C-alpha cells in the first residue's frame, strides 16, 4: 500500500536543500526530545504513541456505542469546540457524500455540530430543525464548563429531555470528558450517561484519535479502524529511529522553519479537492495554537483551489512575498465524470471533450504550482494517494508529529495555549460572572 509522501523540490530557491539539511541535527534532537519526554509541555505527549496504543477492546466499545446511537437517532449532534470539533468535522466532510443530507438511502445519522460558537440564531435554527426528529448528543468537554459547549449542551439537553423524557434521554447522550473531575463528569455520573475519557496527557488539538474524534466519526459510518491504522503506519514512519532523509515529519518541520527564518511568515495550506476544506481548518488550529506564542510563529492560512484562485489568487501571485504554500495533492478520485461534446461549442470547451474532470483539475493544480513558484512562493507538496480513512489517519499523525518537532525547533512550548485565556477573562468580566468583580469594574471603565 502506498503512503502519503512529501516533496520539497519546489520550495527550494528561497532556501536551498543544503540549508534545509543543515537543520538535520536540530530536527532530530527535537524528535529525541519528544520521544524522551524531556521538553516543554512534556505532560501533554499522550498523542505521540496514541495510535499504536489503542486496543481492539477500546475500538469495539466505541463502535458499539456508535451503533446504539445509530439505531436510536436520525440526527446526532456533536457538541465541542476547537480540537473537540474540528477533527471530527474534517473526517466526516472528507469521507461522506458532499450532499449527504439529501440522500434518500442514507444508512447513517446526519451529523450536526454545536458548541463551536455562541451564535443565538445558529442555536435557534438548530433547535428548530431538531424538533420532531429522533436525535442524540455527544457532549465533548474535559471540564464541562467551557462557555460555548456548555451553553449548547444546556439548551439541547433540555430539548431532548422534554421530547423523550429523562430516562430515554440518558441513553441518547454520551459524555466524553475527564476521568474523575469536572462538571460534565459529575453530571454524567449523576445521570448515568455512557462516558469515554479524554486522556489527561492529550491536548484538545491533538485529540482526534481519542474518543473525542473516534466516536462521532464512527457514528457517521466511517471506519475508525482504518483511520487508526493509517495513523499507526505514520507513527512508525516518523519514529525517532527513522533517519532525517527518510522522515517526512522532520523534513517538513525543518523546511518550514528554514523558510520562516528567511522571511516567509505565512504558510498557506492549499488543496484542489473541495472535501478537504475542514482538514485545513483542523490544521490551522493545530499549528496556530502550537506555534503562535512568545512573539513568534508562522501564521497558518488556507485556500480551497481552484475556488480561491478567483479571490485570493491575485494576492498569492503578486502580493507581499512573505508566504509559502503547502499543497495537499490527491492522486486518485473516487468517481469518474467525463466532459461531454457539445455540438455548438459556444463555451469553447470541446477541446476538453472526453477528458476526465479530474484531468482538468490536475492541470490547473500543476499550472498554479508553476505560476506561484515563478511568482516567488515556495511550494511544499504533500502527496495523498486518495481521500480515505487510512490516508487521513496518516495525514493527521504526520501533521501532529511535524508540529511537535517544528514547535521545539522554533523554541516554543507547542503544547500550551496561554493566549486563549485573555478573551475569556474579559468576556466573564463583561458578563459579571461571580468572582470577576474587580476585573468587571476595571474593564467597564475602559468602555
From Swiss-Prot:
Q: Where in the cell is it found?
A: Cytoplasm
Keywords, sorted A to Z:
Cytoplasm, Gluconeogenesis, Glycolysis, Isomerase
Catalysed reaction equations from the record: alpha-D-glucose 6-phosphate = beta-D-fructose 6-phosphate
Query: Might you give the EC number(s) for this enzyme?
Result: 5.3.1.9
Question: What's a Pfam family in this record?
Answer: PGI
Which Gene Ontology BP terms does the record give? gluconeogenesis; glucose 6-phosphate metabolic process; glycolytic process
What is this protein's function per UniProt? Answer: Catalyzes the reversible isomerization of glucose-6-phosphate to fructose-6-phosphate.
Q: What is this protein called?
A: Glucose-6-phosphate isomerase
